[in-house]
Amino acid sequence: YVALALWMTKYYVQEYGFNLQTAALLAACFSLPGGVLRAAGGWMSDKWGAHSVTWWVMWVSWICLFLLSYPQTEMVIQTVNGPQNLSIGLNATMFTVLIFIVGIAFAFGKASVFKYISDDFPQNIGAVSGIVGLAGGMGGFILPIMFGALVDITGVRSSAFMLMYGVVWVSLIWMYFSEVRKTPMMGQGANSPVSKAS
């Protein structure tokens, strides 16, 4: 979250040509829900469990990051009527909508992480919270450097989202084998909307 929040303004300036003020305003579409909606994420984690909320957060993030990671592409298609140019890529509006959704998902995810801590480490909440905070701080420091290195290596600005997509993909696989197969799909027993429907 911190890494993307730091990266967004520069991305808007370089990818879409906005001035700094407009870019910062649009970048807030990611940062604002990521901070404001944590309470809603905490409520959802209390109601359906941290594991379930995190699982769905991962899937929403995975889909959005896949779309965000696709670079601006120009293709020439040879048709019977001659060559046709085809442009594939997100315009600024679609990009902002997707990054807003990612911001909401990350807000819920941040809340569910601390629900994890209270559920799984009730005797060591302070120590584990400190480790989680350290990991978040290091991610906010290291990932922007990696984003810049990827842009230098590939020349593709959306490579930052490719990296995030890969991280979420690995996390989904890890979470599936370590947790999802052992728990109900949407929460804890009778409190799950899925179990009520069935």
Predicted features by range, described:
Residues N124-T154:
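A late C-terminal transmembrane helix in Major Facilitator Superfamily
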Residues Y1-G35:
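Extracytoplasmic gate region of multi-pass secondary transporters
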Residues Y165-S198:
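Multi-pass alpha-helical transporter architecture, strongest
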Residues H51-V113:
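C-terminal transmembrane helical hairpin of 12-TM major facilitator-type secondary transporters
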Residues Y116-G126:
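Paired intracellular helix-loop junctions of major facilitator superfamily
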Residues L37-G49, V151-D152:
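Helix-to-loop junctions at the C-terminal end of transmembrane segments
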Residues S31-A39, G137-F141:
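Residue-level signature of mid-helix packing/kink "hotspots" within the transmembrane helices
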Residues A149-G166:
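A membrane-interface helix-boundary motif in multi-pass transporters
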